[in-house]
């Protein structure tokens, strides 16, 4: 794998706010694959679980599709984009209804191999 080539994995429509996910992503950006998994495993945030799955998936993609060593992988890019919002209604007094927006996000992880 040359320095320009990268391996990517995306988790789409994850049912958590992109703002909450970005707080966790900032802690693992630029770290090695193994270090990122260790950090994610012990974080007290709900966003850690779906991010852990995507990081694990991108390493599996690198090993199976490009025959790379997982120990040499470094997270070069990681970001969360906003997905569609699920719209729900909360009944209120006197026949009114309030709108509830339940956010989703798309988590993208790109890794590169260091030599």
Curated annotation (Swiss-Prot):
Top-level taxon:
Eukaryota
List the molecular function annotations (GO) for this entry: rRNA binding; structural constituent of ribosome
Q: Does the keyword Transmembrane helix apply?
A: no
Q: Which biological process terms from the Gene Ontology are attached to this UniProt entry?
A: translation
Give the signal peptide range. Answer: none
Per the annotation, which location comes first and is thus the protein's main one?
Answer: plastid
Q: Which family does it belong to?
A: Belongs to the universal ribosomal protein uL22 family.
Known function: This protein binds specifically to 23S rRNA. The globular domain of the protein is located near the polypeptide exit tunnel on the outside of the subunit, while an extended beta-hairpin is found that lines the wall of the exit tunnel in the center of the 70S ribosome.
Q: What is this protein called?
A: Large ribosomal subunit protein uL22c
Natural source organism: Thalassiosira pseudonana (Marine diatom)
């Amino acid at each position: 794998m040359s320095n320009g080539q990268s391996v990517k994995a995306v988790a789409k429509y994850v049912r958590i706010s992109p703002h909450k996910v970005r707080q966790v992503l900032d802690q693992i950006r630029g770290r090695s694959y193994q270090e990122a998994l260790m950090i994610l495993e012990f974080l007290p945030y709900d966003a850690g679980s779906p991010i852990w799955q995507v990081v694990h998936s991108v390493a599996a993609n690198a090993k199976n599709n490009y025959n790379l060593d997982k120990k040499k992988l470094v997270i070069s890019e990681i970001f969360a984009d906003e997905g569609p919002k699920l719209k729900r209604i909360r009944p209120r007094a006197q026949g009114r209804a309030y709108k509830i927006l339940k956010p989703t996000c798309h988590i993208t992880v790109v890794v590169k191999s260091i030599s």
